[in-house]
Regions:
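Classical eukaryotic N-terminal signal peptides for Sec-dependent ER targeting/secretion
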Residues: 1-35
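Short, intrinsically disordered, charge-balanced linker/junction segments flanking boundaries
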Residues: 29-33, 197-208
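N-terminal signal peptide
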Residues: 35-54
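N-terminal carbohydrate-binding/catalytic regions of secreted carbohydrate-active enzymes
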Residues: 49-174
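Surface-exposed acidic, glycine-flexible loop patches that form ligand/cofactor-binding
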Residues: 81-86, 176-190, 231-234
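Loop/turn elements at helix/coil->beta-strand transitions in domains of secreted/extracellular proteins
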Residues: 89-92, 189-194, 238
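Solvent-exposed loop/turn segments at secondary-structure junctions
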Residues: 98-102, 200-204, 248-251, 259-261
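Catalytic cores of secreted/periplasmic or lumenal enzymes
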Residues: 209-331
């Protein structure tokens, strides 16, 4: 993945819902997080998803005594570096770049709305997943906010910056959205997150290189004998995107200025709370195994419920217990 900080966090990623997910000409989607809007420095890091085993799920008994240590390692040194976390309400504004079908938009909207949904809806839940993120505090002891809501949206159907976006032109797309003469997106200096999502015919610079895109809903041909999982909402690209959106909202909340919660000594290359659990979706996950997930009667794989839909979202690092946790944990 490629990341750019604007006195905060900016992220560009793309996902593919097709089996040959490394080919940028196929159906792809990108997202960009932009938090605040001032100066910028660029950094490059590689996102990865672990290669899977041939079995997607195993029984609880097979986990033995290791099921409570998903992702744990004596080498993980997540530290708090005294910077702020997002304790104010988070508002996610979306820029739809290109022609987006309404059905796909609805899936993404519901996921964002599910983060702060009432706790009494079906478990395991998206809001239950966010509780792990809320464990992180600033130096005053204030926790990350419970409130994450969908803000305003802007459609850029005419592709104002062309069908090919670079990291620099992506910055221009967001700047245009917040400075537009008609219906500009509002600027929230304490909790505004700007999410740029590109349609399937838009190419983004360096998309999906040196990584496995949209796994486990898409599997490259070089892994023989493994079929992609059925996505919970019938949209492999969008369902794969949901986990990346969740990943980055969790990290922008816990490390917005690259000086709060992360592992490693270099703040320009931080390993953040979702990076530590990349590819882990359930109990027993770690290494090359995704963990125990849920399968519905229609064959779809998921690990948490939203307001009305189901989603497959990676776990995040829990600094209290020092391993990855999620709402669908068997223990």
């Amino acid at each position: 993945m490629y990341l750019c900080h604007f006195s905060s966090t900016t992220l560009l990623k793309k996902l593919s819902g097709n089996r040959r997910s490394m080919a940028p000409s196929l159906h792809t989607l990108s997202l960009l997080f932009f938090f605040f809007f001032f100066f910028c420095f660029l950094r490059l890091s590689t996102a990865w998803r672990p290669l899977p085993r041939m079995k997607n799920n195993v029984t609880e008994l097979e986990f033995g005594g290791y099921k409570k240590y998903e992702g744990s390692s004596e080498f993980v040194k997540l530290k708090y570096h005294m910077g702020p976390v997002l304790t104010s309400n988070i508002t996610v504004h979306i820029i739809w770049y290109g022609a987006w079908p309404s059905a796909q938009k609805r899936i993404i909207r519901e996921f964002i709305n599910s983060i702060s949904a009432a706790a009494d809806h079906r478990s395991p839940s998206v809001s239950g997943w966010w509780k792990t993120v809320q464990l992180y505090t600033d130096q005053t002891g204030s926790n990350i906010t419970r409130s994450v809501r969908l803000g305003q949206e802007k459609n850029d159907r005419l592709l104002s910056h062309g069908k090919t976006l670079t990291r620099l032109s992506i910055q221009s797309v967001i700047k245009s959205a917040v400075t537009a003469k008609t219906k500009p997106l509002p600027i929230h200096p304490k909790g505004g997150v700007y999410l740029l999502l590109t349609a399937d015919d838009v190419y983004v610079e360096d998309f999906c290189k040196k990584c496995m895109c949209a796994y486990p809903f898409s599997v490259p041909d070089y892994i023989p004998g493994l079929k992609p999982l059925k996505s919970p909402n019938g949209e492999a690209a969008i369902d794969g995107m949901i986990s990346v959106i969740a990943h980055e909202i969790a990290e922008v909340a816990s490390n917005p200025l690259a000086n709060a919660w992360y592992a490693g000594e270099d703040p320009s290359f931080p390993v953040e709370i979702a990076d530590l659990c990349e590819g882990i979706y359930g109990t027993g996950g770690g290494g090359s195994y995704t963990g125990q997930m849920l399968n519905d009667e229609d064959g779809a794989t998921y690990n948490m419920h939203g307001i009305r839909r189901r989603f497959l979202v990676q776990w995040v690092w829990n600094h209290v217990v020092n391993y990855c946790t999620g709402p669908n944990a068997l223990d």
